[in-house]
Amino acid sequence: MNIFNPNHDRKAIVIFSGGQDSTTCLFQAIAEYGKENIEAITFQYGQRHAIELEKARAIVQDLGIKQTLIDTSVMKAITHNALMDEQAHIEQKENELPNTFVDGRNALFLLYAAIYAKGQGIQDIITGVCETDFSGYPDCRDVFIKSMNVTLNLAMDYQFNIKTPLMYLTKAQTWQLADELGVLDYVQKHTHTCYEGIEGGCGKCPSCILRNKGLKKYLTQKGRKNV
């Protein structure tokens, strides 16, 4: 897995939630661009797992990365889903999107990130979306990202480059990437993934299950290679 591609003459902004995927992307971006060329942008959209905002703030402070926090909580007034309703039971019915899907979330994140990036003279936008081990969210697909990239370029007459380093990685491979970057323990200890907002994870929600299953698979594979 090629993780180092020195690109220190450019700047990049990472859409950063404080979760496993975006934190792994942040570390990879630091390796590729240099810490001084990286910024993080985080969104407060009324998520029930607001603890991730605390994790995000702690991580960027620890790493010395500039963070911009954008309030998009107006979304709660126009859409309903289990990720923004603490009383809703998280579930996925057959042949339907999970009720944790937030309509328009990634489109909005990319739009605001692009507006900010252009103002800072930044072209590269990094997001940790993935369509290999994902929950069926349509806005995590590569076809959407490519479409959004074209739309933003046309909308602002600016050459954005949306990068998705995790797009075709399984969750186990994302853990592998963190390990290759030398930050597996850091990601495991300091990031938050749980939809329920429970410190350390509930172990039962789809996000926790995917995270834990991926870690177990990677560590098992790593153990076999070291035998």
Swiss-Prot record:
UniProt-annotated binding residues for Zn(2+): 194, 202, 205, 208
Q: What is one GO biological process annotated to this record? A: queuosine biosynthetic process
Q: Which reaction does it catalyse?
A: 7-carboxy-7-deazaguanine + NH4(+) + ATP = 7-cyano-7-deazaguanine + ADP + phosphate + H2O + H(+)
Q: Which residues form a coiled coil?
A: none
For this UniProt entry, which segments traverse the membrane? Answer: none
Needed co-factor(s): Zn(2+)
Please state which protein family the record places this protein in: Belongs to the QueC family.
Please state what the protein is called: 7-cyano-7-deazaguanine synthase
Q: Gene for this protein? A: queC
